């Protein structure tokens, strides 16, 4: 099963791009209370001074609203919004074309900035710091350096892997913001709003059931809501209750805590093949036939956040909660070995 095929994948699909479902202002945006409060201050200050907002870096797992927040920022600043992603900017000319078309105070959003070509990144430094492009025109003896003045713009970038950003690039962002997983209450509010927009009758306990299985991620909550709507429609349900939501999500193999077949396979593999751990990430990747990056970026963050696994110097170890979730009793010797592992950290 590839990552995009999972219904609980936070990777964006075409069906997830529904502009009617997206909040249009910071006041409408649910969750990320600290980030929203700080952004309001920074936006109001920049708007009052008539200046470009400092460059912003959003850090966090996929599906938490980084793109939506960038769009809201541009809307509340009253400026144009341009969007691209790191892998798309293949060469310096691509970046130059983007930057030279920006107007004063415009917002340029670069998703997956950690995947930016290193040669392109070098061009970005003076653009961010001095609002200048420093390009080499021509080759050999005829080559010459050309400086191009740029409009004072705001770069808003997003990354799921802060550690892959170079220090010079990371240090040029004046406003770093880390986004966190959402609470069940926040996701319930998002699901309720989505159902209202879709004209879908949804009981409070039905919204809560969907929210509890959405892995702390609004994008997944929206996807689960659409699939539950399909099941409810075919079943002729007039109102989506907890019972209907539970039946639909169980059919989709999403359990009560939001784990799917791949998550359970991950946990079962560590129990059955390695006695609960510790086991190294490369071994896990080989056993699951999944790329290491996918495991570290997509599967493990939620399992760690839920307290199912721990990363130790000797590898991954299942916590007692994971054993119980699988219907198993954690061995006493494993509990003792976990204590010893954390004493070594």
Swiss-Prot record:
The keyword DNA damage applies. The keyword DNA damage applies. GO terms for cellular component: cytoplasm; Holliday junction resolvase complex. Mg(2+) binds at residue 67. One of its GO terms (biological process) is DNA recombination. Residues 4-182 are annotated as: Large ATPase domain (RuvB-L). Its EC number is 3.6.4.-. DNA binds at residues 292, 311, 316. It catalyses: ATP + H2O = ADP + phosphate + H(+). Residues 256-345 are annotated as: Head domain (RuvB-H). It is an enzyme of class 3 (hydrolase). It is found in: Cytoplasm. GO terms for molecular function: ATP binding; ATP hydrolysis activity; four-way junction DNA binding; four-way junction helicase activity. SMART domains: AAA. Keywords: ATP-binding, Cytoplasm, DNA damage, DNA recombination, DNA repair, DNA-binding, Hydrolase, Nucleotide-binding. It holds the Pfam family RuvB_N. InterPro entries: AAA+_ATPase, AAA_lid_4, DNA_helicase_Holl-junc_RuvB, P-loop_NTPase, RuvB-like_N, RuvB_C, WH-like_DNA-bd_sf, WH_DNA-bd_sf. Homohexamer. Forms an RuvA(8)-RuvB(12)-Holliday junction (HJ) complex. HJ DNA is sandwiched between 2 RuvA tetramers; dsDNA enters through RuvA and exits via RuvB. An RuvB hexamer assembles on each DNA strand where it exits the tetramer. Each RuvB hexamer is contacted by two RuvA subunits (via domain III) on 2 adjacent RuvB subunits; this complex drives branch migration. In the full resolvosome a probable DNA-RuvA(4)-RuvB(12)-RuvC(2) complex forms which resolves the HJ. Has 3 domains, the large (RuvB-L) and small ATPase (RuvB-S) domains and the C-terminal head (RuvB-H) domain. The head domain binds DNA, while the ATPase domains jointly bind ATP, ADP or are empty depending on the state of the subunit in the translocation cycle. During a single DNA translocation step the structure of each domain remains the same, but their relative positions change. The RuvA-RuvB-RuvC complex processes Holliday junction (HJ) DNA during genetic recombination and DNA repair, while the RuvA-RuvB complex plays an important role in the rescue of blocked DNA replication forks via replication fork reversal (RFR). RuvA specifically binds to HJ cruciform DNA, conferring on it an open structure. The RuvB hexamer acts as an ATP-dependent pump, pulling dsDNA into and through the RuvAB complex. RuvB forms 2 homohexamers on either side of HJ DNA bound by 1 or 2 RuvA tetramers; 4 subunits per hexamer contact DNA at a time. This is Holliday junction branch migration complex subunit RuvB. It comes from Chelativorans sp. (strain BNC1).
């Amino acid at each position: 099963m590839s990552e995009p095929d999972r219904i609980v994948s936070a990777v964006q699909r075409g069906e997830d791009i529904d502009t009617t479902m997206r909040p249009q202002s910071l006041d409408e945006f649910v969750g990320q209370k600290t980030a929203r409060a700080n952004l309001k201050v920074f936006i109001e200050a920049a708007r009052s001074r008539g200046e470009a907002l400092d460059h912003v870096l959003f850090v966090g797992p996929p599906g938490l609203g980084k793109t939506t927040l960038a769009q809201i920022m541009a809307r509340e600043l009253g400026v144009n919004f341009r969007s691209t992603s790191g892998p798309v900017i293949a060469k310096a000319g691509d970046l130059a074309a983007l930057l030279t078309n920006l107007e004063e105070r415009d917002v340029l959003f670069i998703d997956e900035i950690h995947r930016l070509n290193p040669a392109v990144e070098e061009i970005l430094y003076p653009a961010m710091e001095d609002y200048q492009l420093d390009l080499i025109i021509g080759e050999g003896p005829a080559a010459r350096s050309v400086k191009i003045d740029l409009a004072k713009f705001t770069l808003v970038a997003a990354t799921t892997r802060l550690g892959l950003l170079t220090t010079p690039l990371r240090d040029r962002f004046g406003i770093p913001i880390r986004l966190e997983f959402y609470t069940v209450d926040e996701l319930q509010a998002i699901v309720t709003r989505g159902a209202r927009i879709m004209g879908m009758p949804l009981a409070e306990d039905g919204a809560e059931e969907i929210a509890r299985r959405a892995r702390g991620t609004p994008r997944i909550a929206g996807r689960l809501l659409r699939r539950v709507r399909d099941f409810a429609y075919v079943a002729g349900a007039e109102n989506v209750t907890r019972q209907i939501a539970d039946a639909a999500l169980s059919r989709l193999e999403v359990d009560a805590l939001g784990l799917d077949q791949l998550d359970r396979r991950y946990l079962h593999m560590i129990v059955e093949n390695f006695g609960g751990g510790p086991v190294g990430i490369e071994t896990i990747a080989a056993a699951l036939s999944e790329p290491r990056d996918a495991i570290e970026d997509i599967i493990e963050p939620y399992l760690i956040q839920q307290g199912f696994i721990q990363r130790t110097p000797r590898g991954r170890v299942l916590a007692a909660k994971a054993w119980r979730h699988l219907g198993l009793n954690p061995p006493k010797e494993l509990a003792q070995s976990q204590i010893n592992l954390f004493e070594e950290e």
